Amino acid sequence: MSKLSRHAAIRDAITSHPVQNQDELRRLLFKRGHRVTQATLSRDIHELGLVKTGEGYQFPSSEDDSNAAWLPSVERLIREFVYDVKIAQNTVVVKTSAGSAQPVAAALDAEGWPEVVGTVGGDDTIFVVTPSNKDAEKLQSRIKELIA
């Protein structure tokens, strides 16, 4: 199971049950098909920005109805999952680790970068359409800076 799917399972567990401690969260994840160590779970909790309150683990802005509190930044997703980027005229081809293309593509779409008209994400490849060849070069440079 990928880190992204594990993080999604943690988010689902936290939002659907009051979770008081890491062992309880580990058991909920196990029921969802994720076997995790305490060290991995602790890292995930930190990466997701969960806070422990009297009511259990929560996202910092749980009073906010938006899911933005748990979404990683596009920069972080690019740094973590993208390993190559090439240009084909006004299309940028982004290579990611297996299973990571769709979340990265969704983040690129949501970010509102002017160089991005739209994306198509497969399993490990994203096609990013840009308005022009010059915009494709700008986007390639932007992504290369993040993965360097």
Swiss-Prot record:
It is found in: Cytoplasm. Its main location: cytoplasm. It comes from the Bacteria. One of its GO terms (biological process) is protein complex oligomerization. The keyword Cytoplasm applies. One of its GO terms (molecular function) is DNA binding. GO terms for cellular component: cytoplasm. Gene3D superfamilies: 3.30.1360.40, Winged helix-like DNA-binding domain superfamily/Winged helix DNA-binding domain. Keywords: Amino-acid biosynthesis, Arginine biosynthesis, Cytoplasm, DNA-binding, Repressor, Transcription, Transcription regulation. Pathway: Amino-acid biosynthesis; L-arginine biosynthesis [regulation]. Pfam families: Arg_repressor (PF01316), Arg_repressor_C (PF02863). Regulates arginine biosynthesis genes. Belongs to the ArgR family. HAMAP family: Arg_repressor. This is Arginine repressor. The gene is argR.
